[in-house]
Amino acid sequence: MHSNQNYSLKSSNSFNIKASCSRIYFPSSLAELQQLPDLSAGNTSDNFYILGEGSNTLFVEAQAPIIIQPKFNGISIVEQDDHFVVTVGAAENWHDLVCFCLEQGIYGLENLALIPGSVGAAPVQNIGAYGVEFADFCQEIQWYEFASETLHSLTKQACRFAYRDSIFKQERYNKGLITQVTFNFPKAWQANLSYAGLDTLAKESTAKQVMAQVIALRSSKLPDPKELPNAGSFFKNPIVNDADFAQLQQQYPKIPHFPQKNGEIKLAAGWLIDQAGLKGFRHGDVGVHQQQALVLVNYGSELGAEIISLAKYIQQKVAKKFSVSLIPEVRMITHKGERSFSSLSDLNPIENITVIGDSNSIRGSSDD
């Protein structure tokens, strides 16, 4: 199995943060997975991180833990009478998969075009955009368990997908890694145009037309990480109960909201940040994107801690204005492995800053 020591991770995270690990492994087969050091609970389970393409990762410290970057590739298609079964290696690029499927006449993922990252990372977060989620087409996940050194097949139901959540962030967290994903795409396809920005398309639009519109929308709102380092949406869209929403709507009648099946209401985190006066806000070499307030950008910092301080500042401002808590979607990695945002208590929010004017300027003052 290929591995490296003292490996730089700067080009392996879309924030372009300077970090390195003592060792990185690149397993590409079951035999190579079985050659990994003992990562089962009670050994080094807190001191490693499974890295995809680094598009949803923030290295908080200069020293990262042991890194495992699976290299399972390949795509296979089995055509049935009324559906396609597509099996994909975890290391395949997500957007490339979307394009490949459409080229093969397999539709369903077009709303998820241009989402950065690998296929293996998609089920962990249950990625979603423009009214579609990964879980909508998942059939099965192949998962390697560290303790037993065996592969397991998990059904869609067993994965317990929820909004930006799955069993891989819960009971099976750090107990194994995803090697392969199997999708089920019905041949009976209808465009999902329910989301704002897509509702201007004709009902007869093709999947390629939908994908083109999604790409145009994302490109107009989200900066290219290669040009302006970022990790896409930094915070999850918060979900509140109907009573709390009623109070918010009374005060802010135009607040964007999305009713959920369970009766709760999903809010737009980007709108909340914008209304808090932080769109385009910049502090030193980190800031909030000028077109999409949900995206935090790195203008040249090499320190993940500076992104954390900015995020905590945003969190405080939104909580003060709306009494709504923003929870990061991006994963926080220290030398001990992944940590929750709230546990990073030694990193303080930006202090003595007041947003003035058009929110692109800042000045020092006492922050009330």
UniProtKB/Swiss-Prot annotation:
Catalytic residues as annotated in Swiss-Prot or TrEMBL: R164, S233, E329
The FAD-binding PCMH-type domain, residue ranges: 17-188
Superkingdom, taxonomy of origin: Bacteria
Cofactor(s) the protein needs: FAD
Enzyme class: oxidoreductase
UniProtKB keywords: Cell cycle, Cell division, Cell shape, Cell wall biogenesis/degradation, Cytoplasm, FAD, Flavoprotein, NADP, Oxidoreductase, Peptidoglycan synthesis
Pathway where it operates: Cell wall biogenesis; peptidoglycan biosynthesis
Cross-referenced Pfam families: FAD_binding_4 (PF01565), MurB_C (PF02873)
GO cellular component, as recorded: cytosol
Entry-linked Gene3D superfamilies: 3.30.465.10, UDP-N-acetylenolpyruvoylglucosamine reductase, C-terminal domain (3.90.78.10), Uridine Diphospho-n-acetylenolpyruvylglucosamine Reductase, domain 2 (3.30.43.10)
E.C. number: 1.3.1.98
GO molecular-function terms, A-Z: FAD binding; UDP-N-acetylmuramate dehydrogenase activity
Cellular compartment(s): Cytoplasm
GO BP field: cell division; cell wall organization; peptidoglycan biosynthetic process; regulation of cell shape
Catalyzed chemical reaction(s): UDP-N-acetyl-alpha-D-muramate + NADP(+) = UDP-N-acetyl-3-O-(1-carboxyvinyl)-alpha-D-glucosamine + NADPH + H(+)
Family per record: Belongs to the MurB family.
Known function: Cell wall formation.
Listed PANTHER family: UDP-N-ACETYLENOLPYRUVOYLGLUCOSAMINE REDUCTASE (PTHR21071:SF4)
Record-given protein name: UDP-N-acetylenolpyruvoylglucosamine reductase
